[in-house]
């Protein structure tokens, strides 16, 4: 439910795949990804890059989390593949590590903040991502750079 009639929020209970992603996300202006697996993140990343839709993505495993704001509407944004090239599901799985439950709420809050900044066209997050360590209460801003060999975005 939204306060304004002009805002439409969609969520999906089905698993995103290469076969259904166009149908699921074609009417989206922004994509907020909080999926729990690397394969889905890669599919969403490729779709958002291809369609030039901003992607706000969050992930957490154990006590640590990350928030990414990929500005694909800009021609100079790195992508998820630039950062995680060569890693697979086993490298980033929470099946064995689990998640510190309150951290998921914190990541969700940061996703909302980043989404609002995108809607308002505020550019404080460009080419950076946040790493959160909830065990030590540290939040670090990291620089994202385009991988010149990235199979998704290097042919801009």
Predicted regions and their residues:
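Adenine nucleotide-associated cytosolic modules
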Residues: 4-156
